[in-house]
Amino acid sequence: MASSSGSNHICSRVIDHSHVPEFEVATWIKITLILVYLIIFVVGILGNSVTIRVTQVLQKKGYLQKEVTDHMVSLACSDILVFLIGMPMEFYSIIWNPLTTPSYALSCKLHTFLFETCSYATLLHVLTLSFERYIAICHPFKYKAVSGPRQVKLLIGFVWVTSALVALPLLFAMGIEYPLVNVPTHKGLNCNLSRTRHHDEPGNSNMSICTNLSNRWEVFQSSIFGAFAVYLVVLASVAFMCWNMMKVLMKSKQGTLAGTGPQLQLRKSESEESRTARRQTIIFLRLIVVTLAVCWMPNQIRRIMAAAKPKHDWTRTYFRAYMILLPFSDTFFYLSSVVNPLLYNVSSQQFRKVFWQVLCCRLTLQHANQEKRQRARFISTKDSTSSARSPLIFLASRRSNSSSRRTNKVFLSTFQTEAKPGEAKPQPLSPESPQTGSETKPAGSTTENSLQEQEV
């Protein structure tokens, strides 16, 4: 008897047909979201489009490897698709006018599938880009094995194929349906709520929404929980890699002399510039993890709430918590696709400089070889002027210091093959990479040969 009384008490709080119109948010929320979504849309499209152009310029000018460029361009494309596919359709069908008729079932399925694919492509691109940087910093001798053009294409292909597989179940589980249709296979509350024509004839209901179909409940649940597991694995993996990269970057590199013969490697005391670059990189790595956690978690919680139990078992408190969370989770989710260009600008002075040049249509960046030659000529002229009145030991010291100053101001150096003799080859650099404050220099190298030094 007590069990029956408790069940009746819970059933008195379960939503019914009178609550269905509340799936449409209040007008003031709609207007606020219009303004917020418009700002996010413009900033996101512009920022990611400029990012694509900047990475192409940096690669062409010799500052960025093609493999890193491919990763960043693919990530920016997935972010742009998230905005183009997700934001207009989601705002209209979920926020502005959620109640519709079943005639829009195909558009609901396609939108959900494509949006899920692009969303998880963005997530997995963060994973692969972090993995590429992790190998370069923590396991540099293994870097070439995973950084070739073929390996990068395989990684990018893996990202898009895996994202499509994660989203594929939603193509069958989603559709247009009256939200309170009973799920036949679900053993939930037996409340015997009053039925309406929308229950009996869901195919003719004008109060349907784009939601999970009642006869595909298990498919929907497995899809949402599986996607959540993928998110947790990616978050944990990126956090692990960023933590290990930060440990490597925080190690002291003072006073180490290694090597034999003509090749000597001198690890110098860090300059203020190197310390600043390292601090910015550590901040950048932390921001990657924070962005994945803060921007993605609210949306994942909302999805788990939708998959935890069918809507006909939702209490009024549960339903209102879901509707309050909806606009916040969507906003934070779209912000995750806006912050990537911002992180690049924070992490690299070179990227930030070219970003604003592209934005202002005033590109003045010189090729890396040309810039190094100009610096070499300036140093040669300066050294020849002062050599008559300076001991050779001080002259050699100044040349060593000038070589240190020629290090490009970017963060995680990308290892390249050494230039051939007599050929100046630039050191392409990743815009999210810190300099390590060490150099490899042949004994007795001339100023011209300094263009071929390999800076690690």
Curated annotation (Swiss-Prot):
UniProt topology in membrane: Multi-pass membrane protein
Function field: Zinc-sensing receptor that can sense changes in extracellular Zn(2+), mediate Zn(2+) signal transmission, and participates in the regulation of numerous physiological processes including glucose homeostasis regulation, gastrointestinal mobility, hormone secretion and cell death. Activation by Zn(2+) in keratinocytes increases the intracellular concentration of Ca(2+) and activates the ERK/MAPK and PI3K/AKT signaling pathways leading to epithelial repair.
Entry's family note: Belongs to the G-protein coupled receptor 1 family.
Cytoplasmic side: 56-69, 132-151, 243-283, 345-456
GO CC terms of this entry: plasma membrane
Keyword Transmembrane helix among UniProt keywords: yes
Source species: Mus musculus (Mouse)
Positions bearing Phosphoserine: S397
UniProt subcellular location: Cell membrane
A GO molecular-function annotation: metal ion binding
Composition bias, Polar residues: 430-456
Main subcellular location: membrane
Residues in the Extracellular compartment per record: 1-34, 90-109, 173-217, 306-323
Chain residue ranges for the region called Disordered: 415-456
Name the record gives this protein: G-protein coupled receptor 39
Disulfide bonds: C11-C191, C108-C210
Gene name of this polypeptide: Gpr39
SUBUNIT field: Interacts with HTR1A. Interacts with GALR1.
Traits of the deletion mutant: GPR39-deletion mice show a significant increase in body weight when fed with a high-fat diet, with about 2-fold increase in fat mass compared with control mice. In addition, GPR39 knockout impairs declarative memory and spares procedural memory.
